[in-house]
Amino acid sequence: TVSNNLNLPHFAPKAKRIIYLFQSGGPSQHDLFDYKPKLNEMKGIDLPESVRMGQRLTGMTSGQSNFPLVGSATNFKQYGEARAWVSDLLPYIGKISDELCFIKSMHTEAINHDPAVTFFQTGSQQPGRPSMGSWLSYGLGSLNKNLPDFVVLLSRGTGRPKGQPLYSRLWGNGFLSSLHQGVQFRSAKDPVLFLKNPESLSKQERRKMLDYLSELNEEQEKKFGDKEVSNRISQYEMAYRMQTSVPETMDISDEPENILKLYGPNANKPGTYAANCILARKLIEKDVRFVQLYHMGWDQHSDLPMQIKGQANDVDQPTAALIMDLKQRGLLEDTLIVWGGEFGRTSYGQLQTSLSKEDLRVIKAGKYGRDHHPRCFTIFMAGAG
């Protein structure tokens, strides 16, 4: 009956896992996905008051005496059956655009990086709430007992290597159990800190220590009734299993040459976005519930035409490869991929000078940037049916 179906979704949910390719810093939608030929024609014209309508501008350009409009720093081309407009900076993503759902109406109230990133990770600008991956772990449970439900990977962009810092609270569990916090896998010799046994300690000795420690913790739990004690026991056991599962997962030496080629020239360089995309696929194959990639360096306040080329080159081929690799393995059907940052960039240029007579010269020389723009920007999704 109708009454029995009121709580059912219109379509059966397919997503079991998520890969969030977070582009930290705020990618410029004008130079990647949002084709505006009229804006190119208006290059150098001051932002019309009919558009601004007295709205507050973000801090780094609020002191400019003028706001010259700047079109895209690159050309655009239409791709696929959907004829999606994609920048020449992203040819690989353009070629798979029919696999993508572009959302060009994103909006946020945050105008600075930290509250904006925090909002996208937790649903609140105030720090301390559980992150998205923690909620998925809490609500859906684990699919793999040998790896965390929620894994975090970080990479730095070549466009602006010294990007905005990221903090571990972005993948924190907040008021949820510590079982649901994200675990960062690093590209260094020890992917997870303090996971390896000291050289003088054998695996058998470690097992005996954990068994004894578990007995002590169980006594503490009976005495005080604190659930975090049992959580600690579970975390010690997970760490023990991860001593085997993490090195196996982080090792990409057995990836076929054609797969490494698919992900691009940086695929076998640990810590790069390309290498992390391969690791994301491996984690999804092992049924990790939520994989969070952060790629830093998208904060182009100056020298945007040059910096954004490096950033786009970092992510273009690996992102497309990840989507198609999951598809050919039958994993895209129940894996949701999200690509995007914390806000967009302004349609006017951020200048190092406020002299109007120099605006056009600065823009033509490519020495401009774009300020933060929270009111409208673009992300895309793929997969999950």
Q: Which residues fall in each region the model found?
A:
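Ligand-binding pockets and gating/stacking loops
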Residues: T1-G385
